């Protein structure tokens, strides 16, 4: 069992975030991967009269696994973003940005994989307090946000990670 509140030294220092990442990567997501594979086999073996229900259940498992991956990506992003804010070495800062771009690509792949599942079952992504935060409209919106981050925001930010500024430093009066 995983009890995050029981991790010795977990405090505002950031250790908890790393413990969460370790648990997601080594325990939680692999367990969901195994569960999805078992459910795929169950769908194949399901009698015709239960196949539709079994397929919906498989979709729920796959959708939730995608949400776990999003959680992992968000936690990794948070850590890299904080490191980037305080990094004074341009080479290391650019390496951090490369890692951030990898996370964007992983999350875009994750979202694209779950869109057909959400389109097939409109109940997925609905949460009573937040409405359809995981519905297809929001999934496409998320892809647009990730593309903008990759193609615009991070590219402009990367230009600031150099002693050779790509624009004039002279001030106009």
Predicted feature residues:
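Substrate-binding groove of N-acetylhexosamine-processing glycoside hydrolases
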Residues: 1-173
């Amino acid at each position: 069992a995983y009890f995050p509140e029981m991790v010795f030294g977990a405090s505002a220092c950031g250790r908890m975030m790393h413990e969460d990442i370790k648990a997601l990567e080594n325990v939680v997501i692999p367990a969901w991967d195994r569960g999805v594979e078992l459910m795929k086999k169950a769908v194949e073996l399901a009698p015709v009269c239960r196949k539709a229900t079994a397929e919906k259940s498989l979709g729920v498992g796959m959708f939730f696994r995608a949400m776990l991956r999003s959680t992992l990506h968000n936690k990794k992003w948070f850590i890299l973003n904080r490191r980037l804010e305080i990094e004074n070495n341009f080479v290391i800062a650019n390496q951090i940005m490369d890692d951030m771009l990898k996370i964007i690509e992983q999350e875009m792949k994750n979202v694209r994989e779950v869109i057909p599942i959400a389109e097939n079952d409109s109940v997925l992504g609905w949460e009573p307090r937040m409405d359809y935060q995981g519905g297809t409209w929001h999934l496409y919106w998320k892809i647009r946000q990730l593309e903008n981050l990759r193609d615009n925001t991070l590219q402009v930010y990367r230009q600031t990670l150099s002693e050779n500024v790509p624009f004039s430093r002279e001030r106009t009066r």
